[in-house]
Swiss-Prot record:
NCBIfam families: PRK05298.1 (NF003673), uvrb (TIGR00631). It comes from the Bacteria. Belongs to the UvrB family. This is UvrABC system protein B. The UvrABC repair system catalyzes the recognition and processing of DNA lesions. A damage recognition complex composed of 2 UvrA and 2 UvrB subunits scans DNA for abnormalities. Upon binding of the UvrA(2)B(2) complex to a putative damaged site, the DNA wraps around one UvrB monomer. DNA wrap is dependent on ATP binding by UvrB and probably causes local melting of the DNA helix, facilitating insertion of UvrB beta-hairpin between the DNA strands. Then UvrB probes one DNA strand for the presence of a lesion. GO terms for molecular function: ATP binding; ATP hydrolysis activity; DNA binding; excinuclease ABC activity; helicase activity. The beta-hairpin motif is involved in DNA binding. The gene is uvrB. Residues 26-183 form the Helicase ATP-binding domain. InterPro entries: Helicase/UvrB_N, Helicase_ATP-bd, Helicase_C-like, P-loop_NTPase, UVR_dom, UVR_dom_sf, UvrB, UvrB_inter. GO terms for biological process: nucleotide-excision repair; SOS response. Residues 431-597 form the Helicase C-terminal domain.
Amino acid sequence: MSKPFKLNSAFKPSGDQPEAIRRLEEGLEDGLAHQTLLGVTGSGKTFTIANVIADLQRPTMVLAPNKTLAAQLYGEMKEFFPDNAVEYFVSYYDYYQPEAYVPSSDTFIEKDASVNEHIEQMRLSATKALLERRDVVVVASVSAIYGLGDPDLYLKMMLHLTVGMIIDQRAILRRLAELQYTRNDQAFQRGTFRVRGEVIDIFPAESDDIALRVELFDEEVERLSLFDPLTGQVESTIQRYTIYPKTHYVTPRERIVQAMEEIKDELVDRRRIMQENNKLLEEQRLTQRTQFDLEMMNELGYCSGIENYSRYLSGRGPGEPPPTLFDYLPADGLLVVDESHVTIPQIGGMFRGDRARKETLVEYGFRLPSALDNRPLKFEEFEALAPQTIYVSATPGNYELEKSGGEVVDQVVRPTGLLDPIIEVRPVATQVDDLLSEIRLRAAINERVLVTTLTKRMAEDLTEYLEEHGERVRYLHSDIDTVERMEIIRDLRLGEFDVLVGINLLREGLDMPEVSLVAILDADKEGFLRSERSLIQTIGRAARNVNGKAILYGDKITPSMAKAIGETERRREKQQLYNEEHGIVPQGLNKKVVDILALGQNIAKTKAKGKGKSRAAAKSGVVEMDMTPKALQQKIHELEGQMMQHAQNLEFEEAAEIRDQLHQLRELFIAAS
């Protein structure tokens, strides 16, 4: 199943990349646990990491600070490794309200969640790839430090089928039910199976477009074949197949029975303590809720909120870390922490917020104390589990620098020859009028401007002022969700407007080559929005344009400003020197607007062609590229309905055509899901 990593790129490493690749590989081979890659905006950090992965041939997990950047990295890695397993592992909740209790108003909030099925399938595909092969790159968000099913139990539950094996039909159906597959002879979809005589069709939970047909003769498996679940066309016959559980949380029956006894013992102890403390209402509430859960587990093998009993189900002791995605990563795996100055503090903060909420639930009798062990990893547990790690950032934090022993791999020179922006400091008194004249200069030559302010009020007032003076301006603030944010960035790049105003504005990761000016108002107000790292990240947004410039408005130069200006000038000098020595003329980036959202777009087309079904990809490609993420979501629902209708009418050609369109649309939508 595994293949060697094969890097697919028209470019060879250039600029600082060859040296960075060499130093990182040497460090990994010498056994260094921590290394830091300081790569400026637009220097090709992802390409450098892809080269390291391809050269060392090691399974890799890439941690990103949010879904948007994870989606962008997933798209890039898919293009670099089209023949290998590039997987995507982020939270599968479109909406999630954890259960909580507010003592002051005596309000209990039930858990409420909406699961994105496509992302759930991709998570299952990610763990399957890690268990089966070595040529795997998993792009994950901080979701990777949250509890997942125990890999040992997960492996125990798998159903192995081989041609010629002796097994009766009822045994297969019983095993499928234990894996939480449901029988559905009408609507054949992911995580279901259907039975027709001695033929069992199974739609694997981790698969998007292929199903398994098991043909029995008496009690022997006569034939195994993979087929298209939509058209019924057989793709290939195989000798063996492994069916993985429908969720990561399946548990063998004997483990559930054992866990139930342990839960009963804990309930007895907890009831005694509550009665001694005269907490009779809480004791009655806890007894009722726990006994209901136990009855559900006894009858069905699971219950709502079963994750709260995960300590017993995975056989852990009190306080032990939960199994996570890190337990699925091989021992010689590699961890890459992207935008580490943001991701590392995030990992540290997850445990404390979760703990505070659960302690209230335990205290007031909604949960047993063992529910506290259903939690994300503590930071020290993450450190203990993490394999050899490369931290990637334009502005590494103190933690990464300390762990790397101050040794930083510099990647300052860009392959395109682009220089860091010129920085000017101008007085605050005339900042708004000065900014207006600068905006007009940029708008006249079809370039864009980013403006960052300190407060929401100032951002609103500035937007209003610029609009009154005839400028095309939009305002980005924290109330805007991911989908709208992507739309605004897209519209800025397309030239629907010229100026984007924000507060903690668009720092990490997103590429906007059209932006030639970044204006930072009140740059001399020392604080987290005007720290050295914040300033360098914000200035870096203009580093993808040949005419890149940053204007810092301030009446004095603060220590943070001095450091940010000093670091930017150091980089600019190094870049200029390299360009002069090698005769390089800086070139602007012509990055297509769709690239922000187009995840593995070309891969989806290639995959479709490989199956002889590319006819729809070409037809639909043009339409979808101009659609907003909101429209994409509506289009997906609409097309799914059409596809099922065609399949019911036995119009398989049309159904397959729509299915190929859906492949592309879903890839595009991941960024906004």
